Amino acid sequence: MDIYHKPPCSKSRQTLEILIQRNITPRVIKYLETPPNIDELKSLMVKLGITQVREMMRTKEALYKELGLSSADNETLLKAIAAHPKLLERPIVVSNNKAKLGRPPEQVIEIL
């Protein structure tokens, strides 16, 4: 099990705590330090069951607006996340072939 984690983020910490309380020790991926590449992002989309990259993006992030991404296509958005990982919504928990966004944190329980 993996968690794409940002330690300062309260939702990310709460999600990690939910896993730990269930005796799950996930591989913690600090995605700002080790950004996912485009293939990893595409794999995340499949596991999340989404077709639009925006569904896993922080669209309210100032950088999103600065880069003018509001009308960008999926490929452009994937490249933007790979280059600027702070645009990736967090946390994301991956278990086998499924993933869930921890917003709210309890949502990840569905794939445990």
Where are these regions (language model features)?
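Short, solvent-exposed secondary-structure junction/capping segments
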Residues: 25-26, 61
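Thiol/selenol-based redox catalytic cores and closely related redox-interacting motifs
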Residues: 31-112
